[in-house]
Regions:
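Anion-recognition interface
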Residues: 1-371, 375-378, 385
Length: 386
């Protein structure tokens, strides 16, 4: 009997670490009769899912590479890991996954690791700050680049983080017994890490040495990258600014109330998730303790930040760095004036002075437009992968 272990993510739950560990041990695994099949060089098979941003929203499609990958396997026990499977939510797409698996395997085990929504979104949005342009990464397409450590609750974001509804669709196609649902938290993982935990599902005493892939970004890179992309800065300019952003080891964090509100947006889904797949004493599948968050977040770009970072910006070699700095400064003041809480503390005179500063900055603030070289139009549009 042939068995497929299909690891579907989610994103930001140690998937890269698991994939790299499996990739490094693929020869030893094969000696034990376990085949790790992958599309990517580091073990990620997310290239089997196309992710497209259209005017009507995000669209996810299983492409032919998944069938080709499974068809090339030979062992009785096979592992495939692709966190982009966690994007799928339409019954027709998940049924297609099931049908392709059934062509080659007698049994499929679907493995999903979940993370509390606010913690997940904070980490996933960091991934979008590693790039230099809108729409190149799955994080950019799903979460966007608006200000704040957490994304806006768009329909696509609500769909992605409705874990219960999504898992019900996987159950409808594969059956409840086929699902292995785990919380991505050291205290609830075998051995305290995802690699050891996943190996325990395979049985036979398999030992896979853990590894850790750290993909976090510092606060400076997070705030500046997201803001520059939001303002439409040229990707080449952002790329030249990156070295100056990376000297900051601090991490961006939302305020406690904002994090709790994001989590509570999925309260009903989490109650059902706790009842059926991921029981927790809180009744919400995850801990409802938010004490690790500060009362006030550090996830908004401030004038003080720009004063501290201006030297690196001005010396970056980009076109018109002063114009870019002034555009960032103008945006900071605009945000301050439009914030109902902050604006309520400003006297009429101070608000007027800030408006005057904006008028002065309007004469110098400038974002250099992106220039698209002719050869870039020949590049195949990125639809899958990270």
């Amino acid at each position: 009997m042939r068995t497929l272990y299909l690891h579907i993510g989610f994103h930001k739950t140690g998937s890269s670490s698991l994939q790299l560990a499996l990739h490094r041990c693929r020869a030893a695994l094969l000696d034990r009769g376990v085949e790790f099949a992958a599309l990517g060089k580091k073990g990620n098979s997310s290239g089997a899912i196309d992710v497209e941003a259209r005017d009507t929203g995000l669209h996810f499609h299983l492409n032919d590479r998944f069938r080709q990958l499974l068809a090339a396997t030979r062992s009785d026990t096979v592992i495939v890991s692709a966190e982009h499977f966690s994007f799928l939510y339409r019954p027709v797409d998940i049924e297609r996954v099931r049908d392709i698996c059934a062509e080659h395997f007698d049994r499929t085990v679907v493995v999903a690791y979940l993370r509390r929504q606010d913690l997940h979104a904070r980490s996933f949005k960091q991934q979008g700050a590693r790039g230099c342009e809108r729409g190149r990464s799955s994080s950019s397409k799903l979460l966007g680049h608006e200000a704040g450590a957490l994304p806006q609750l768009t329909p696509a974001v609500r769909t992605y983080y409705d874990y219960f509804s999504k898992l019900r669709q996987w159950e409808a196609s594969f059956g409840r017994d086929a699902l292995q649902v785990r919380e991505f938290r050291p205290a609830r993982l075998q051995g305290g890490d995802i690699v050891t935990d996943f190996a325990s599902l395979l049985g036979d005493g398999l030992d896979i040495p853990p590894c850790r892939v750290n993909e976090g970004v510092g606060r400076r890179e997070f705030l500046l990258t997201h803001k520059l992309i939001e303002l439409g800065a040229a990707p080449g300019d952002i790329r030249r600014l990156k070295p100056g952003m990376r000297g900051d080891s601090s991490r961006v964090t939302p305020g406690r109330d904002n994090a709790r509100a994001f989590f509570e947006a999925f309260a009903e889904s989490n109650r059902q998730l706790s009842e059926r797949y991921l029981q927790h004493e809180s009744g919400l599948a995850f801990s409802d303790d938010f004490s690790t968050y500060p009362e006030t977040g550090n996830d908004l770009l401030s004038c003080a930040d720009l004063a501290e970072w201006s030297a690196d910006l001005l010396g970056s070699g980009i076109e018109n760095p002063r114009g870019l700095r002034d555009a960032l400064l103008d945006d900071c003041i605009r945000s301050l004036l439009e914030d109902p809480v902050a604006a309520g503390t400003l006297s009429q005179g101070v608000a007027g002075e800030l408006q005057g500063i904006r008028q002065c900055l309007a004469r110098t603030a400038a974002i250099a437009p992106a220039r698209t070289p002719w050869w870039s139009r020949l590049r195949r549009k990125k639809r899958s992968g990270r």
